[in-house]
Design a protein with these regions (language model features):
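Short helix/strand-capping hinge loops at secondary-structure junctions
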Residues: 72, 78-80
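A contiguous active-site-proximal alpha/beta segment in oxidoreductase catalytic domains
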Residues: 82-170
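A cross-family glycoside hydrolase active-site/sugar-binding cleft signature
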Residues: 55, 78, 106-108
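N-terminal glycine-/serine-/threonine-rich beta1-alpha1-beta2 phosphate-ribose binding loop
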Residues: 1-73, 86-102
Length: 174
């Protein structure tokens, strides 16, 4: 784990400890942690593996994705990958670079694998159920899907505490 010191890191490590110490089927994760403001540069210089998981504060995510792909790392990025339209071209270039470098750049939005999402997709493709899809446009899409980050939610049965940056659209996104 490479991260700045603070409540996000502590919350993550506490959650890992809960998994490691639960009564039923405990995990045995051994977290090796580097804390510091230079966490990203340290991770790139040490390159302890070939996959990086990017989650947390989204302000610099497009940069972190790009730099990771350029370093030859496979990237699993939590949503959203970008929070401002200006970063779309950067993200698009990162996907192209990932292809050139033979690495994976993947959005790990777990919701896409939930049965309700899979059923929605299947039903939308069944004309006898859904009907014919109307023509849409960028300003007026035919179909929209909204994913909500709830202020209050449970993670593994424990209330998730949101850190201050979560409420800042310049860091979390809208």
């Amino acid at each position: 784990v490479y991260a700045p010191d603070g409540p996000d890191l502590q919350q993550h490590l506490s959650r890992i400890n809960l998994y490691n110490t639960r009564a039923t089927d405990p995990a045995s994760w051994n977290e090796i942690v580097y804390k510091g403001d230079d966490f990203f540069e340290k991770m790139l210089s040490e390159k302890p593996g070939n996959v990086v998981v990017l989650s947390g504060n989204n302000r610099k995510k497009a940069e972190y994705i790009t730099r990771s792909v350029e370093a030859g790392l496979n990237v699993l990025a939590d949503k959203p990958m970008i929070i401002v339209p200006e970063d779309f071209a950067t993200l698009e270039a990162a996907f192209n670079k990932a292809g050139e470098n033979g690495v994976l750049l993947y959005d790990i939005m777990t919701e896409r694998f939930e049965i309700t999402t899979i059923l929605q997709k299947l039903l939308s493709q069944e004309e006898s159920v859904f009907g014919k899809l109307e023509a849409g446009s960028e300003k007026d899409p035919a179909v929209t899907k909204v994913s909500v980050n709830h202020f209050s939610k449970l993670v593994s049965g424990v209330p998730l505490q949101r850190t201050a940056w979560f409420f800042d659209v310049d860091q979390q996104g809208e």
